[in-house]
């Protein structure tokens, strides 16, 4: 067989090589990944936490925050190293793209206060003066006379309109519920 003149053979070999590589690089690993079982004790998100996850995706939070702890000493403050089962119930898994902000894998344990999270969502510099995270004030409203059912967010003076009370909207609560749900399951070795 002369490959210099037999173009059908060249195209056939290229297609065969492409298909073979596709099977070994993409298809077989994907089939193996589908067999991954959830980490024992892992619960699927529901209710406000699930809706908050959708808002997290919509706002692009994964651009600056990761949800993946590397098994390295430098990542020890964020929790144990992540394993495949930690993401078995997520679609898509939210690993993040870069760690401009802190890793959120275990933020539900590290920062469990609803009020702190709401203040941070409204204006991050109100609780972390060096934060470069943008605020999300559109998830809040201002009222002169809040209702008893309103969730009041104690924003410091100068960071909110004068004579106004900051009230968390449903979406703000949903995002915070999602963040509070981010807790690693302990794994027995």
List PLM regions with ranges:
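Electron-transfer interface patches adjacent to heme c in soluble/periplasmic c-type cytochromes
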Residues: 11-20, 77-172, 182
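Short, solvent-exposed loop/turn and secondary-structure capping segments
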Residues: 23-29, 66-68, 73-77, 132, ...
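Electrostatic cytochrome c docking/interface patches
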Residues: 33-57, 69-77, 91, 189
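The canonical Cys-X-X-Cys-His
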Residues: 52, 58-67, 175-179
């Amino acid at each position: 067989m002369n490959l210099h003149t037999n173009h059908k053979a060249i195209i056939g070999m290229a297609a065969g090589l492409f298909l073979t590589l596709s099977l070994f690089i993409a298809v077989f690993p994907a089939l193996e990944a589908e067999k991954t079982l959830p980490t024992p004790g892992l619960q699927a998100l529901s209710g406000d936490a699930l809706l908050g996850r959708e808002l997290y995706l919509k706002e692009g939070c994964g651009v600056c925050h990761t949800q993946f702890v590397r098994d390295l000493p430098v990542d020890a403050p964020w929790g144990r190293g992540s394993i495949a089962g930690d993401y078995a119930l997520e679609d898509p898994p939210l690993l993040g793209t870069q760690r401009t902000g802190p890793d959120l894998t275990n933020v539900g344990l590290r920062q469990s206060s609803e009020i702190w999270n709401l203040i941070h969502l409204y204006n991050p510099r109100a609780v972390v003066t060096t934060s470069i995270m943008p605020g999300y004030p559109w998830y809040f409203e201002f009222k002169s006379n809040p209702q008893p059912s309103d969730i009041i967010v104690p924003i410091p003076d100068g960071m909110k309109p004068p004579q106004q009370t900051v009230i968390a909207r449903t979406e703000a609560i949903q995002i915070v519920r999602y963040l509070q749900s981010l807790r690693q399951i302990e794994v027995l070795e």
